Amino acid sequence: MRLYKAMALCLPLVVICTSEVSQSTAETMKSKAQDSYKRVVEHGKTCLERMCGLLSRGKGMLYTRVKNIVSSIRRGGEKNEEVAGPVDGEGSEEEAFDLSPEDIEKLIEEIKKKLAGYMDVTGEQNEEEEKKEL
């Protein structure tokens, strides 16, 4: 009976001590998890900022290339006495990207013609060379 009374008195004390240890352990683990989470979030923000910077630079480079190609085609059209639009090449970004499907096809054909002297773009040159060799 004395053992039972001693157990009855000690059990709440053991439960309290155990819960306090668990609580402090839980707080420690929580703070470690929060620190890790904060580091991951900061790393994610840094990566996102870098990615946005790269995309912005890529957009600028693409805009410049399209603008140069369009102005080159317009200059080539002038040489052939074809009027393709203003020659100054000072169009806005919206102008450069506001092309109809027909304009895009024309651009692709012009680019293929310009590159034909440097490399085989369409595969037609190799066929013609093979026919000449036979």
Curated annotation (Swiss-Prot):
Superkingdom as given in the UniProt entry: Eukaryota
Signal peptide: 1-26
Record keywords, A-Z: Signal
Residue segments, region Disordered: 77-98
Protein name: Uncharacterized protein ECU01_0440
Organism: Encephalitozoon cuniculi (strain GB-M1)
Taxonomy of the source species: Eukaryota, Fungi, Fungi incertae sedis, Microsporidia, Unikaryonidae
